[in-house]
């Protein structure tokens, strides 16, 4: 029998380990459509918790929700040249509006559309079209809108949650009277994402600006939060874009200023997706399955009653129901502790391993002997599966929120220590090549490099399969020359292999 619940382990085959964690935790599965996944109830419950927190944070910063069409006229994308060029290869196109029988029991497309429709890869163009109708005067500004929806981008190499053809996300779109307001909005939402990643996902991130070659198509500036996974590859976890007046001009978003002058507006967009669940898995999970930070866990505590006969069953169930009630009366991060009693007709060990693989933070086993002593037997997901301890029942209830927060903080600190130990300052091309030359499936972490725009697109990057992740916002002065061009460096840039 394997020593761990997941095979292969992280050290044996990290990409396959990742897929097996998703299967073992019963989070998602592949669908009949290539590149599209089924998000199962446990995985979707994590997404719902993410949605709930983010939605509140958006509303606390003045945003409201709306919904815009899935289908976008091709001509809308063509209005913004850089935008359409950036997404052209990923677009799914609808060309017909009905089906008909071919006489042999098969269905074929019929009724060709006058203009092809694009299944949204992102919604700047169609939302911009609507904003142009909504904005007449400076009094109509700002517009601060978010939508929760699905998007479609054909992907050749798919991986559940991390990179799928269809995925769920939120996209925020805002319109402002001045560049300054739009830039402030862009950074405000970057900070919202950073706060969410660190305080709820327990995933440390680096806030930064993308280099020009990595910007969102059509953006003036793209800001990002970058995380480092356990295999030392980077993950772009969220982006916020200052679009300048590019999309406003393409969509004719104009307003009459207080001085009576017609002006083009300034816009932003920002988004995160179900890719965050992939980041959550790869930041915290271990060789026994998913590890989910308590603040996002669908369940905080699972109670497993242990008994040998009907008489013991009745007594233990009464005891654990009272325990469940007392635990639910405790408040953790603004809501009741989420508790479940698992009374299925299964061995206790089987149940425990299911919840270990699903990442439930706290497992509680209660049998007649525990009940007689007024105790509970507690296991924590951030420790080994055999590390369990008896606790006095009332003390456990009183301490549950502290225990959950201790686990949350511990997961963050562990991930931060790993990240911080995996950033290396490199000031010459030879050391850079050596740092990243371990092969396609090995990554050392972040390389912090002196850089200038003349060094963009260096041929060595493609050979090493390394990309610039960001120019960190927290920059110390850079000295010396860009390692790629030899010209004076202007910024420190983080490079890494990435997802």
Swiss-Prot record:
<dbReference type="Pfam" id="PF09180">
    <property type="entry name" value="ProRS-C_1"/>
</dbReference>
<dbReference type="InterPro" id="IPR016061">
    <property type="entry name" value="Pro-tRNA_ligase_II_C"/>
</dbReference>
<keyword id="KW-0648">Protein biosynthesis</keyword>
<dbReference type="InterPro" id="IPR017449">
    <property type="entry name" value="Pro-tRNA_synth_II"/>
</dbReference>
<keyword id="KW-0067">ATP-binding</keyword>
<comment type="subunit">
    <text>Homodimer.</text>
</comment>
<dbReference type="InterPro" id="IPR045864">
    <property type="entry name" value="aa-tRNA-synth_II/BPL/LPL"/>
</dbReference>
<dbReference type="InterPro" id="IPR033721">
    <property type="entry name" value="ProRS_core_arch_euk"/>
</dbReference>
<dbReference type="Pfam" id="PF03129">
    <property type="entry name" value="HGTP_anticodon"/>
</dbReference>
<keyword id="KW-0436">Ligase</keyword>
<dbReference type="InterPro" id="IPR006195">
    <property type="entry name" value="aa-tRNA-synth_II"/>
</dbReference>
<protein>
    <recommendedName>
        <fullName>Proline--tRNA ligase</fullName>
        <ecNumber>6.1.1.15</ecNumber>
    </recommendedName>
</protein>
<dbReference type="GO" id="GO:0006433">
    <property type="term" value="P:prolyl-tRNA aminoacylation"/>
</dbReference>
<dbReference type="InterPro" id="IPR036621">
    <property type="entry name" value="Anticodon-bd_dom_sf"/>
</dbReference>
<dbReference type="GO" id="GO:0004827">
    <property type="term" value="F:proline-tRNA ligase activity"/>
</dbReference>
<keyword id="KW-0547">Nucleotide-binding</keyword>
<keyword id="KW-0030">Aminoacyl-tRNA synthetase</keyword>
<comment type="function">
    <text>Catalyzes the attachment of proline to tRNA(Pro) in a two-step reaction: proline is first activated by ATP to form Pro-AMP and then transferred to the acceptor end of tRNA(Pro).</text>
</comment>
<dbReference type="Pfam" id="PF00587">
    <property type="entry name" value="tRNA-synt_2b"/>
</dbReference>
<dbReference type="InterPro" id="IPR004154">
    <property type="entry name" value="Anticodon-bd"/>
</dbReference>
<comment type="similarity">
    <text>Belongs to the class-II aminoacyl-tRNA synthetase family. ProS type 3 subfamily.</text>
</comment>
<dbReference type="GO" id="GO:0005737">
    <property type="term" value="C:cytoplasm"/>
</dbReference>
<dbReference type="GO" id="GO:0017101">
    <property type="term" value="C:aminoacyl-tRNA synthetase multienzyme complex"/>
</dbReference>
<dbReference type="GO" id="GO:0005524">
    <property type="term" value="F:ATP binding"/>
</dbReference>
<dbReference type="InterPro" id="IPR002314">
    <property type="entry name" value="aa-tRNA-synt_IIb"/>
</dbReference>
<keyword id="KW-0963">Cytoplasm</keyword>
<dbReference type="InterPro" id="IPR004499">
    <property type="entry name" value="Pro-tRNA-ligase_IIa_arc-type"/>
</dbReference>
